């Protein structure tokens, strides 16, 4: 049930673009719905892997973004330093002597830092944004078309689990 929030974040980051492929799997324990789910989304230039697990003794709300120049890890349950920027990248070295069987991957690591993020109440901010959208007659970030896109992804993922 937390995947809906992750999908909303991905939808926002992707500016509403739909994935080109959706695959999902899960396991049922103790009830008729999946307790553990894995959803894989493919977009034009990258992939997303979501894991939801309400049985795990370790509660995590993390988002990892791996880019060509840097990597980010956002840990929502931490009280401080929720965002860590890794000055790290991976590059595939190519050349005449490198084939599919012996390609070379080079990892470059330059350290990490955590930018300051002012602690705020996410629920309050969401309600205030919605209120402001009504007062100013502007479209909210969580609008009907965004909700429909996220719902369609969830529906396809759920159907994949029942195959």
Give short role names for the model-derived ranges:
Residues 42, 66, 84-88:
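A generic structural motif
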Residues 1-58, 64, 77-78, 145-148:
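Rossmann-like dinucleotide-binding domain that binds NAD(P)(H)
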Residues 73-106:
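Mobile, glycine-enriched helix-loop/loop "lid" segments at the mouths of ligand-binding/catalytic clefts
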Residues 115, 122-163:
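C-terminal helix-rich "cap/oligomerization" subdomain common to oxidoreductases
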Residues 14-15, 88, 162:
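A generic structural signal for secondary-structure junctions
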Residues 108-115:
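Short glycine/proline- and acidic residue-enriched helix-loop micro-motifs
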Residues 4, 97-98, 117-125:
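Alpha-helix N-cap/helix-start motif at coil-to-helix transitions, marked by capping-box chemistry
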